[in-house]
């Protein structure tokens, strides 16, 4: 998720044989993943072929990345070479998610004070995720196991982590007392991550700025540590000169960061893409990705504002997670569209959950909105998991590799 990905370059070496079995130690997990998979493979043969031709390109370096590189280089040397890069990534993501879910349990409305250890665990969890996310690409090169699946898996985990990171930050500063600000901060974070890959879809190059995700993550770690040390009193204190509560400081930083980042993203997008006549890398309109993230944000805003029972105000964490899973799904599809040089289609099963909420409100909420929100949350989560498992398994099968294990003999060719 961070600027260190510029050094990862996990788009490596391909082969197209198909595996004959899952392997006995992993047979149960393999059967489970087959059960979860979509009935129809998400990628066509032509998309898989273009995936083989994909090359990772990035430019730019964030402010703290050179400082952190020494630590990351040391850390990857401590990892056994039999551990797969994707396994490192998923472990970091699970730690990040679990620590945030614990915080959500104690603060379901983002207004409560959680035990001190929960804030500390979130800070540690995010640091672990940042560190493991930084070394997975290094481990891939170190073990000679770089593939396009690694890049996709990395970005996919980042898209989900973004949801939990922004939610955890809002809980840490008790932003639930200001629901409009909490709504803005969470969806601004998702939107900026989407835009980073939108401009990549247009230009073919992932760009990193001076202030990028590494810096933002460290800022959020500090927020969690302050929450552990200062508690509610800290966030109620007023900021001199600005005369606003301390809890709005992260929100104001989000506004500034959104304006700065989106200005850079849209400058690239509106300059024109690398495709024919200034189109995207897939030859589509540079504005076409707006429909997907725009639909997520518009639906979320309408349901929030039209709710007769203050659905978002009373259940902000459930609400953010529901739409966060939808946002993660469409972001993943954007990354896939870039890597396979293909068009994004607007119709998507990810929108079933939000559609249920919208239709329920349209018919005067004849079903309890809280119940429908839970249904939408479950549907959105299952849809994201099924898509993610399906596409990872399909690509792994096509490249004759395994998602979480390093195969000893892999046919390779130069990707540089």
From Swiss-Prot:
Coiled coil, from the record: none
Record-listed CDP-choline binding positions: 86, 151
Catalytic activities: CDP-ethanolamine + a 1,2-diacyl-sn-glycerol = a 1,2-diacyl-sn-glycero-3-phosphoethanolamine + CMP + H(+); CDP-choline + a 1,2-diacyl-sn-glycerol = a 1,2-diacyl-sn-glycero-3-phosphocholine + CMP + H(+); 1-O-alkyl-2-acyl-sn-glycerol + CDP-choline = a 1-O-alkyl-2-acyl-sn-glycero-3-phosphocholine + CMP + H(+); a 1-O-(1Z-alkenyl)-2-acyl-sn-glycerol + CDP-choline = a 1-O-(1Z-alkenyl)-2-acyl-sn-glycero-3-phosphocholine + CMP + H(+)
Residues involved in Mg(2+) 2 binding: 133, 154, 158
Keyword Protein biosynthesis: no
Root EC class: transferase
Site (Increases basicity of active site His) location in chain: 151
Record-listed Mg(2+) 1 binding positions: 133, 154
GO CC aspect terms: endoplasmic reticulum membrane; nuclear membrane
Catalytic residue positions: 155 (proton acceptor)
Annotated glycan sites: 144
Pathway recorded for this protein: Phospholipid metabolism; phosphatidylethanolamine biosynthesis; phosphatidylethanolamine from ethanolamine: step 3/3; Phospholipid metabolism; phosphatidylcholine biosynthesis; phosphatidylcholine from phosphocholine: step 2/2
Segments passing through the bilayer: 89-108, 116-133, 156-176, 180-199, 210-230, 246-267, 286-306, 315-334, 349-363, 368-388
EC numbers, comma separated: 2.7.8.1, 2.7.8.2, 2.7.8.22
Gene3D superfamilies: 1.20.120.1760
Membrane topology: Multi-pass membrane protein
PROSITE patterns noted in UniProt: CDP_ALCOHOL_P_TRANSF
GO biological process: phosphatidylethanolamine biosynthetic process
Alphabetized InterPro entries for the sequence: CDP-OH_P_trans, CDP-OH_PTrfase_TM_dom, CDP_ALCOHOL_P_TRANSF_CS, CHOPT
UniProt keywords, alphabetically: Endoplasmic reticulum, Glycoprotein, Lipid biosynthesis, Lipid metabolism, Magnesium, Manganese, Membrane, Metal-binding, Nucleus, Phospholipid biosynthesis, Phospholipid metabolism, Transferase, Transmembrane, Transmembrane helix
Subunit comment: Homodimer.
Similarity field: Belongs to the CDP-alcohol phosphatidyltransferase class-I family.
Function: Catalyzes both phosphatidylcholine and phosphatidylethanolamine biosynthesis from CDP-choline and CDP-ethanolamine, respectively. Involved in protein-dependent process of phospholipid transport to distribute phosphatidyl choline to the lumenal surface. Has a higher cholinephosphotransferase activity than ethanolaminephosphotransferase activity.
Name of the protein in its database record: Choline/ethanolaminephosphotransferase 1
Organism: Xenopus tropicalis (Western clawed frog)
